[in-house]
Amino acid sequence: MRMAVSMEDVKKLREMTGAGMLDCKKALEEAGGDIEKAKEILRVKGLAKAEKKAGRETKEGLIYVIVSEDRKKGAMIELNCETDFVARNEEFRKLAERITRHILEKDENKNKSGEGSEILSQELYDEPGKTVETLIKEAIAKIGENIRLSRYCRYDTEDYLHSYVHGGGRIGVLLDFKAPELNDQVLRLVQDVAMQIAAMRPEYVRIEDIPQEVLERERRILREQALQEGKPEHIVDKIVEGKLKKFYQEKVLLEQPFIKEEKKQVKDVIKESGLNVEIKRFCRFELGGL
């Protein structure tokens, strides 16, 4: 015969787990009134449900970024779910914040970026014994949708970091920059640069950052195109260099037309500011952009 449980305990268990009242009552009865044991029972049942949901497609979600107060370290993630409703849910945001904070505080993630699956087995920095994967599965059980950590990025710098999030978490930018000092003018400039990255999708900071094989492939394609168009051999190289300039303006941040003043390139705006700001690297995530 199952023991009677108090409604007070049922409510307490519900607050702790987010599970339904009836499920909490049954778990407490099964656990003989022991709240911790009941939590485990719900967790096991919840995680079993989470496993079933893991096959569903995750298209919505959130790009979440945290930069430390001293601007020396920062982390950004793409966390996906199935619906926009859940993406705007407070529980989902808390999960995104906790995972991002974990990446920021766990030393083994220093200056690393990659697929979310790479960090699932890590024990949480603030709760040893529990992994990132378990945290996500518990959230799946509570929220009722599949959730996936798609990718992450962690920057550590001797200089400064700046972050920018656009569209309520649809695009995020983490920017590493050098400046003699931090002041309002510098912060306005790097905010403009971060917005540029969000809007214009550059892949490299400067031309020298483009891998040689990428440049060679582009040159080869442009050369073939020019020859197929019947351009004379002696002017093909000139045509290729002209078209490469367009390629740079599309892919290279410093070569791009500045979104606030398109007659100028980003490098001109930075130089003319006289602030001695140098853009070192950036990471840009867009929801579903894998």
Curated annotation (Swiss-Prot):
Cellular compartment(s): Cytoplasm
GO molecular function: translation elongation factor activity
Superkingdom: Bacteria
Renumbered residue ranges of the record's region Involved in Mg(2+) ion dislocation from EF-Tu: 83-86
Keyword field contains Protein biosynthesis: yes
GO BP, one annotated term: translational elongation
Function: Associates with the EF-Tu.GDP complex and induces the exchange of GDP to GTP. It remains bound to the aminoacyl-tRNA.EF-Tu.GTP complex up to the GTP hydrolysis stage on the ribosome.
The name this protein goes by in its record: Elongation factor Ts
